[in-house]
A protein has these predicted regions:
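Extracellular/lumenal carbohydrate-interaction signature centered on repeated Trp-anchored short motifs
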Residues: 78-89, 154-157, 178
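Extracellular beta-strand elements of beta-rich domains used
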Residues: 34, 185, 204-207
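Extracellular carbohydrate-recognition regions
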Residues: 25-47
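Solvent-exposed strand-to-loop "edge" motifs in beta-rich extracellular domains
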Residues: 92-99, 168-170
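Beta-strand acidic-aromatic groove motif in beta-rich domains, primarily in extracellular
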Residues: 99-112, 120-122
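Extracellular beta-strand ligand-recognition surfaces/modules
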Residues: 103-108, 143-153, 157-199
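Extended, low-complexity, turn-rich repeat/linker tracts enriched in Gly/Pro/Ser/Thr and Asp/Glu
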Residues: 95-102, 114-116, 193-195
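Short carbohydrate-recognition loop motifs
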Residues: 54-74
């Protein structure tokens, strides 16, 4: 029960971070290329311990390495733009292994703020442990966040995978309405529920107009 209550607070607090966002975005952009470390647009929010987020380079790419040990903290970037104008979200990621319970080795949030907190919504692109690839379900602790299984299980663990999703179409599909403006994009690797350790890697995130 305490773990479930903690998860509710985590989800609600995370969505609540993005109620005040300003600015605009260019037609197409890389959110951050990490070549000079984490850019100034990133902020961290801890809910249970601290997931360590560091920038590394393997000679082929710059990426964020996320290491979680019984922790749940997110790294988020406030950015405002219309999902209909820039619907494509691209990223690459890699995991060490998937986790059990309500923890996910890797996830990317797209947050759609509302002045009414309970109407703030989010698309969560996850590397799932049990949910089959391509399936989605509401977050178990907060109903206005959809969990979308982009990858699932350990079959491709240890490999860099390149992903692409149309957030405009996804929002309409899962929430049955037109999306408000995007307010933030975030990454999160957590193990506060399982009490284990996990490592994940995130490449640069691209926001664009056209699918590849």
């Amino acid at each position: 029960m305490l773990q479930h209550f903690s998860k509710v607070l985590t989800a609600a607090a995370f969505l609540g971070l993005f109620l005040s966002v300003a600015g605009s975005s260019p037609r197409e952009q890389v959110l951050d290329d990490y070549k000079n470390g984490l850019g100034p647009g990133w902020e961290t929010k801890s809910f249970a311990g601290h997931t360590q987020y560091t920038v590394e380079n393997d000679g082929k790419r710059f990426y964020i390495k996320a290491t979680s040990n019984t922790a749940a903290s997110g790294l988020f970037h406030k950015i405002e733009y219309e999902a209909k104008e820039q619907p494509i979200l691209r990223w690459s990621w890699k995991i060490e292994r998937t986790k059990t319970g309500d923890d996910y080795a890797a996830r990317i949030y797209v947050v759609f703020p509302s002045l009414l907190f309970w109407k703030t919504s989010a698309l969560n692109y996850i590397w799932a442990n049990k949910l089959p690839k391509g399936e989605a379900l509401p977050n178990a602790f907060i109903g206005n966040a959809m969990m979308i299984a982009v990858e699932s299980g350990n079959g491709l663990a240890g490999q860099w995978l390149h992903e692409e999703h149309n957030i405009y179409e996804d929002f309409k599909k899962y929430f049955k309405t037109e999306p408000p403006k995007v307010g933030a994009i975030a990454i999160m690797t957590d193990t506060d529920n399982t009490g284990e350790s996990v490592t994940a890697w995130y490449g640069p995130i691209m926001i664009g107009k056209d699918a590849s």
